[in-house]
Amino acid sequence: MTDAPVSRIRNFCIIAHIDHGKSTLADRLLQDTGTVANRDMQEQFLDNMELERERGITIKLQAARMNYTAADGEQYVLNLIDTPGHVDFSYEVSRSLLACEGALLVVDASQGVEAQTLANVYLALENDLEIIPVLNKIDLPGADPDRIKEEVEAIIGLDCSNAIYCSAKTGLGVPEILQAVVDRVPAPADAVEEPTKALIFDSYYDPYRGVIVYFRVMSGRISCKDKVLLMASKKTYELDEIGIMAPNERKVEELHAGEVGYLAASIKAVADARVGDTITLFNAPADEELPGYAEAKPMVFCGLFPTEADQYPDLREALHKLQLSDAALKFEPETSSAMGFGFRCGFLGLLHMEIVQERLEREYDLDLIVTAPSVIYNVNMVDGSEELVDNPATLPDPQKRESIEEPYVRMEIFAPNDYNGALMGLCQERRGEYIDMKYITKDRVTLIYELPLAEVVTDFFDQMKTRTQGYASMEYHLIGYRKNQLVRLDVLINGDRADPLTTIVHQDKAYNVGKALVDKLKELIPRQQFKIPLQASIGSRIIASTSISAIRKDVLAKCYGGDISRKKKLLKKQAKGKKRMKAMGKVDVPQEAFMAVLKLND
């Protein structure tokens, strides 16, 4: 391992939209610098989670240190800090950008700039990162790097005269990228003699050593014998070991300003070593922490219930374990008359929710029922107080509340302009407010809309992809709360309110949603031995209803001809039994029915 001076360290990350080849490029960089031997190489080397490889996305951040001999013959240390590309994980991106001085902007030479790339580029520009444009996949038959270069200049305003053409798949252009990182990314500030400050940009839970913290030393130095203080959580720890990721962990004695490494200190939970927190020395603490950290706030909520009641303790333990490695996941216990005991969980977005659900089922072997996602509403009460509601079933009664405010987002959609009409129609259906439309190039357009987050979290993304044959991409950010005429829509199954199906909808859409919901439930709930009424109600007013007819057993099969009174007696007995069954019977509602709220447009 080379102990490089600060002037020969380069910290950089890769910014790219999903599927533009970021993980493949990271693989090539590791291979070209000899960091990973060819025999150990596997695709998407930095994506450790099985789920990441399968979905082709990066969820958890990884980091890797590479030794590189540049054209001037000097040995440089390049620290690649991998970032997620999905909009849900923008908080993970923002903190990893803080640990870098430069970024490779990877754009697919056949597809061009996408919305999420743009969002991350703006984050990088805010952090004053040196951006190196890289046009990837130039070996594809549909690639047109010159046109895409103009597009990047037009949309982002970056000078692309020295953009690098490459193909991460074949390795073409990779040496030029490594040299460009050395030449164009500035070295970290030489602050070795200043008080020690290090930024935590990621952490994961190791069952044997506790939380492993990934950090970048901003100033000063940290050695493996130090006692450290985490400035935001005010906790102190004796270090067990520090080291570098090359890309597998390797112990070292000391790390100084500009270097990226990991530490283990028997930390119990990820929440104790929060991402964005500042590490300093206990004996010689820094005066102030590093700026710009905001705690991740959940945007989307849903209920998680085990299908078997006796799995509740297992679910609780699994959530606690997941929270050890995912500080953005929030949960609290919840009970429901229809579903029993479970948890109300908060997520960063729909993808985060899906991933958590999939990890619970896959890694902890649980069968889960997931209720439809909702957002946080701000309810202004008659007595002047305010209440935050993340579960539609707990919305206060109409007579107690004055108004309801819901979160709004500003959304930018990128698409070929053939799909303009389809996208505008979709945004209009979702109560969107048209703001602007810009032509980026002659055949690509950006639509800007403001719309309620609740309309986005259900299936907006799927619908957008369906209506544009997969060509559109979107990016959104929260812009605040607005008052709207919202009502709580309850669903009654056999006269009992089914909490998981309760939703908050706009007054004008209530009838249509209620009607669609009961019709969908009629398809999904299996017939029982008694008639099941399905109703949608606002308060005590039923606005839509239908019913599932009973399965009828032929009790007269044994009566051959003969006495009518015998038949009447049997039919009467059957009717009596059905009446009792209706009063006592519990309707078995399958998981698909609880997701019906999401599938109303199918």
UniProtKB/Swiss-Prot annotation:
Instruction: Enumerate the Gene Ontology biological process terms.
Output: positive regulation of translation; translation
Short name of any one Pfam family annotated for the protein: EFG_C
What is the membrane topology noted in the UniProt record heading this document? Peripheral membrane protein
**Gene3D superfamilies, alphabetized:** 3.30.70.240, Elongation factor 4, C-terminal domain (3.30.70.2570), Elongation Factor G (Translational Gtpase), domain 3 (3.30.70.870), P-loop containing nucleotide triphosphate hydrolases (3.40.50.300), Translation factors (2.40.30.10)
Ranges in a coiled coil: none
What's the catalysed reaction?
Answer: GTP + H2O = GDP + phosphate + H(+)
What is this protein's name? Elongation factor 4
Q: Which organism is it from?
A: Synechococcus sp. (strain CC9902)
Gene of this entry: lepA
